[in-house]
Amino acid sequence: MANEIPTKGILKSEALKQYIMETSAYPREHELLKELRKATVQKYGNLSEMEVPVDEGHFLSMLVKIMNAKNTIEIGVFTGYSLLTTALALPEDGRITAIDIDKEAYEVGLEFIKKAGVDHKINFIHSDGLKALDQLVNDKCEFDFAFADADKSSYVNFHERLLKLVKVGGIIAFDNTLWFGFVAEDEDGVPEHMREYRAALIEFNKKLALDPRVEVSQISIGDGITLCRRLV
């Protein structure tokens, strides 16, 4: 297919990637997450690459636990692998506000979320991300942790809203910020359908690096994830 998504991730050694997955990622993966991953592949084929990889899921789970987060927000849910990962990591009284414009994809994962007994933790908002964030800002909501994995060209606008929603000391995580490694390559070598997000993410990464309101760490896991700790 002309628009087939390249194999996700910035780690180019297939042998090393397989070692990481088979040694620590797959053995620790929750059974319902495994089932959800398989269901996503069955329904979406190559597009299942939009889901976070297993090792990144472990990273997010540990981060939420280390932070003792209780109130989180996720923009961009797809079938809910990262959403279920977070729900399993939160305490019984933890809550997630999940936003996505594609309710059909979310419902693929809802079956497994219910099986895990964590559906009571999730408030799903069927909406465009920016519209939903603006409403949450108006409602003066507050979160400990945010995970953004939606329209990459909207990351700058997501960031401004999330700085109003995530408490001082909280974490905002942006996924895919290294975009298959294309951010470090000349545009001529990048597939045409990947160039728009590449350009948007290059500019976004520059803005984050210069933003005095956050402390930034870019993590080379999955397709690249950038952590922003709110300072002011």
UniProtKB/Swiss-Prot annotation:
It catalyses: (E)-caffeoyl-CoA + S-adenosyl-L-methionine = (E)-feruloyl-CoA + S-adenosyl-L-homocysteine + H(+). Pfam families: Methyltransf_3. Binds 1 divalent metal cation per subunit. Keywords: Lignin biosynthesis, Metal-binding, Methyltransferase, S-adenosyl-L-methionine, Transferase. It comes from the Eukaryota. A divalent metal cation binds at D149, D175, N176. This is Putative caffeoyl-CoA O-methyltransferase At1g67980. It comes from Arabidopsis thaliana. One of its GO terms (molecular function) is caffeoyl-CoA O-methyltransferase activity. Pathway: Aromatic compound metabolism; phenylpropanoid biosynthesis. S-adenosyl-L-methionine binds at V52, E74, G76, V77, S82, D100, D151. PANTHER family: O-METHYLTRANSFERASE-RELATED, TAPETUM-SPECIFIC METHYLTRANSFERASE 1. Belongs to the class I-like SAM-binding methyltransferase superfamily. Cation-dependent O-methyltransferase family. CCoAMT subfamily.
